[in-house]
């Protein structure tokens, strides 16, 4: 007796069983789910996989997204705590990790995250040996280094979300002051994602007009318009949002989706992302910091050589030293 489906549908050819644009998100917390919904909203993948250790939360998030399938262009949404579900991913977004406890040192937090990553990263590489790993978990620059060491992947396929969000915040705040859209405000935040990031004031422009030429004191303490405050706001904005709502998730989710889009669509766009900077600007250790990088389907294709002023280079080097002082003491890498 033929089933309803057999009566309805006449097969013509076998469909493809291997996804062509699969993305995995590891960690279904606030950030992981913001990444997931932002990726789905852009219609970037034909399959989305979610992984976490919390099975009920994981299944609930998967079902909730599946119920929205009518409104999405992603044919398959799957989830499991078993990493086999991630097989054949083009991009794996890592948002998992432990949270910093009150009074906990950064080194201790990093070491606890290293212990988590020691389980996660080999599993990712086992099932998707050709993927690009995009690290989002904090402290992102150190954990990108950790991922690179644990994965054995070439450096162009291990990328940290880095200062892509800091740069977006910078351009938004600049745009607010000038009354124009952030896409028309050009400026870059480089270095460490966080407190010691570097604002490249010399390159800030609108329509090719250098703002520092119009206001030579821009970004310094002598500036009557106090543009330096904009960078200060960039650094403090995450703390402010966390103070108000307990965490940040939407902006980082949107930022990650943009990075995924650049890679999956092979767009060769330039983003401020965390990459191995050894050998640039006189940095001698294996540290990851954000520089303007060209991303494509093969990962991080090239780095733009920014003309930095001496004080900006000094800030970058200081960031590198800070990160290395923590990295050199990490165990089990």
UniProtKB/Swiss-Prot annotation:
Coiled-coil intervals in this record?
none
Q: Tell me which residues bind substrate.
A: 106, 138, 169, 248
Active site positions, chain numbering: 193 (proton acceptor)
Provide the alphabetized UniProt keywords.
Cytoplasm, NAD, Oxidoreductase
GO terms of molecular function:
identical protein binding; L-lactate dehydrogenase activity
Catalyses which reaction(s): (S)-lactate + NAD(+) = pyruvate + NADH + H(+)
Q: Where in the cell is it found?
A: Cytoplasm
The EC code for this enzyme is 1.1.1.27
Q: Name one GO biological process term.
A: pyruvate metabolic process
Q: Pathway it belongs to? A: Fermentation; pyruvate fermentation to lactate; (S)-lactate from pyruvate: step 1/1
Principal location class: cytoplasm
GO cellular component entries? cytosol; membrane raft; mitochondrial inner membrane; mitochondrion; oxidoreductase complex
One Pfam family of this chain: Ldh_1_N
What the entry lists under InterPro entries is as follows: L-lactate/malate_DH, L-lactate_DH, L-lactate_DH_AS, Lactate/malate_DH_C, Lactate/malate_DH_N, Lactate_DH/Glyco_Ohase_4_C, NAD(P)-bd_dom_sf
Cystines in this chain: none
Q: Which HAMAP family match?
A: Lactate_dehydrog
| Subunit relationships | Homotetramer.
Could you identify this protein by its name? L-lactate dehydrogenase B chain
Which organism is this protein's natural source? Gallus gallus
């Amino acid at each position: 007796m033929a089933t309803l489906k057999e009566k309805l549908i006449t097969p013509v050819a076998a469909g493809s069983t291997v996804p062509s644009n699969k993305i995995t998100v590891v960690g279904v917390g606030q950030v992981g789910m913001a990444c997931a919904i932002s990726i789905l909203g852009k219609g970037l993948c034909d399959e989305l996989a979610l992984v976490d250790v919390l099975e009920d939360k994981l299944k609930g998030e998967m079902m909730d997204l599946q119920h929205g399938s009518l409104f999405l262009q992603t044919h398959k949404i799957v989830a499991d705590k078993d990493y086999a579900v991630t097989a054949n991913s083009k991009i794996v977004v890592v948002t998992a990790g432990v949270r910093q406890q009150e009074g906990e040192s950064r080194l201790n937090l990093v070491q606890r995250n290293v212990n988590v990553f020691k389980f996660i990263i080999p599993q990712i590489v086992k099932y998707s040996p050709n993927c690009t790993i995009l690290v989002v978990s904090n402290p992102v620059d150190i954990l990108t280094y950790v991922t690179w060491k644990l994965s054995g992947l070439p450096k162009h396929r291990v990328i940290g979300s880095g200062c892509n969000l800091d740069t977006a915040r910078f351009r938004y705040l600049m745009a607010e002051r000038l009354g124009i859209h952030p896409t028309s405000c050009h400026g870059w935040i480089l270095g460490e994602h966080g407190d010691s990031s570097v604002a490249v004031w010399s390159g800030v422009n609108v329509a090719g007009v250098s703002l520092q030429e119009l206001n030579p004191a821009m970004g310094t303490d002598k500036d009557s318009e106090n543009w330096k405050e904009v960078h200060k706001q960039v650094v403090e904005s995450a703390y402010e949002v966390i103070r108000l709502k307990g965490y940040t998730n939407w902006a980082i989710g949107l930022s990650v989706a943009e990075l995924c889009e650049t890679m999956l669509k092979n767009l060769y766009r330039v983003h401020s992302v965390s990459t191995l900077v050894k050998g640039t600007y006189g940095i001698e250790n294996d540290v990851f910091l954000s520089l303007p990088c060209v991303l494509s389907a093969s990962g991080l294709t090239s780095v733009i050589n920014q003309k930095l002023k001496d004080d900006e280079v000094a800030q970058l080097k200081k960031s590198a030293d800070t990160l290395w002082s923590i990295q050199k003491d990490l165990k089990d890498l």
